[in-house]
Amino acid sequence: MHLYISSYYTCLGNLAELMTDWEHAIGFYECALRHNPYSINALSCIATLCSGREQFGKAIEYFKRILAIQEKNGEIWSPLGHCYLMMDNLQDAYHAYQQALYHLPNPKNPKLWYGIGILYDRYGSIEHAEEAFSAVMKMDPHFEKISEIYFRLGIIYKQQQKYDMSLQCFRYILHNPPPPLTEIDIWFQIGHVYEQQKEYEKAKDAYERVLADNSDHAKVLQQLGWLYHQPNTTFSNQSQAINFLTRSLKADGGDAQSWYLLGRCYMAEQNYNRAYEAYQQAVYRDARNPSFWCSIGVLYYQINQYRDALDAYSRAIRLNPYISEVWYDLGTLYESCSNQTQDALDAYQRASELDPSNPHIRQRLELLCKTQGSSR
C-alpha cells in the first residue's frame, strides 16, 4: 500500500513539474518519500528539481541517498559532480565525475563532459578543459549549453595564443551569446583578441562598438586608453589616452591597473609629478604587483634618484624574480653608477637567461662584456 501511495504522489509531483509549479512538486515528492524513503524515482526527481533551482546543497543530500542504495549508479554520480562543482567543491566534484565515468555503461554523455570541462577549467588545466569541451561539441552539436562552450573555448584559445580559433568561437556566438552575457560582452572579447594580435585598428573598432552601447564601460575605456598610448599605431595620441583612462577611473576609481596605465602615459609625456601620483594610487590599491614597482623604479631612474630606483627594483624582484624587464632595468641602473659594472653584467645576464630571444638584452650584454674586456 505504501509503495502505491508513494507512486501516486510521485506522479502528482511529475504533473506539478509539467505545470512549472515547483513548490507543490517538491511537496508531492516529499510525501512520496515519507511513504517510501527508498523510492529511487522520487529521490531522483526531487534531486534534479533542486539542482535545477540551484538548491545544490539539498540536491546533494538526495543524490547521496540514492547512492547509498545504488552505489554504482553512474547516472547519479554525474549530476552529483555537477552540484559539487556549482558549490566550488572541486575535490568532491572530481571524485564524483570519476565514479560516473567508471560506472556509466556509455560515458559519452555531453552533460558529463561539459561538467568535466568546467572542472578542468576551474583547476586551470586548460588543455584538458579544451579536450572535454571539444568532445561535447562532437557528441552533440546542438547541446543546450553549446554557446557557453564556444565562449569558454574562445577564452581558452586566447590563453593558448590560438587567436584565430578564439576569434572563430566569439564570432560564432556574437548574435547568440550565452546568458547572462550580451553581444557587447562578446565584442569586448573580440577586441581583446585583436589587441593580443597587435591588430590595434581592429581592436579599437571592436572596443568602440562597446562604448557606443555603454559610454561608461570602465574596462573598455581602460583598454582604449592603453591602445592610444601605443607608439606604433596610426592613432597614437597620449592626451587622448589620458582622457580615456581618466574616464575609466571616474567609472571605477578602485582599479589599480587604470592608475598604473595612467602613470605610464604621463611618463611618455615626461610629466613625472603626475606619473608619480598615478603610480602611488596604483600601489596603494595593489602593493604586490611587481610591474608597478618596476615602473616606479624607471621613474626614479629618469629623475636621477638612483637609490630610490634601486629600492623599487629590489621590491619588484622580491615579489617576482622572473621578470626579465626588471633585471634589464636594474642592469641599466648599475651601469649608470660608477664601479658597478660587474653588478650590471650580472643583472643583464639574469635578464638574458629569462628572455634569451630578446635582441636588446643580448646586444647590451655583449657590448658591456666587450667594454669590460677592453678596459682590463
Language-model segments: residues:
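Ankyrin-repeat TPLH-centered helix-turn motif and closely related helix/turn capping elements
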Residues: 290-375
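Structural signature of tandem alpha-helical TPR/SEL1-like repeats
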Residues: 18-31, 52-65, 87-102, 124-135, ...
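Structural marker of alpha-solenoid helical repeat scaffolds
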Residues: 35, 69, 103-105, 139-142, ...
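TPR/TPR-like alpha-solenoid helical repeat scaffolds
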Residues: 146-152, 184-188, 225-227, 332, ...
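Position-specific recognition of the canonical hydrophobic site in helix A of tetratricopeptide repeat
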Residues: 10, 17, 51, 78, ...
